[in-house]
Amino acid sequence: MEIHFNNTYLEKIYLGLPVSGKPRYNIEVTEKFRKRIVLLENIENIADLRNFKGLNFEPLKGTKKGLYSIRIDMKYRLEFSIGKNKVTLLGIIIVKDLSNHYR
């Protein structure tokens, strides 16, 4: 899959670039986040996410309708939208946020 970031902070975390200020997430969360992005890059299509039961892939509701999420850990979820690349018919994942799901 093709990955695009709408969130510059998360893109810097993924690329291992320095971020200014106090870190928003601890080391364990950032490492799991990177692993999830690598997983998203390596899947063939969105339907493959359903094969990973531990990710708890789901569409979001309410004010976040149109977004999807997968689990980073019990506290954090990776929120993203899914678009289509009309030329190759590959899904394009646009990373929106890394949220504290229960706050």
Where are the regions that the model predicts?
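Glycine-rich, flexible loop/turn motifs
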Residues: M1, N45-D48, N56, I94, ...
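Arg/Lys-rich, positively charged N-terminal/basic patches that mediate binding to nucleic acids
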Residues: M1-I37
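Short, surface-exposed helix-loop/turn micro-motifs enriched in polar/charged residues
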Residues: E2, Y25, L49-F52, L90
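Amphipathic alpha-helical interface surfaces
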Residues: N6, V29, F33-R36, N56, ...
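Conserved phosphate-interacting/catalytic interface
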Residues: L40
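A short, surface-exposed loop/turn module that caps and links secondary-structure elements
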Residues: E44-Y68
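Enriched for short, Lys/Arg-rich terminal
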Residues: L67-R103
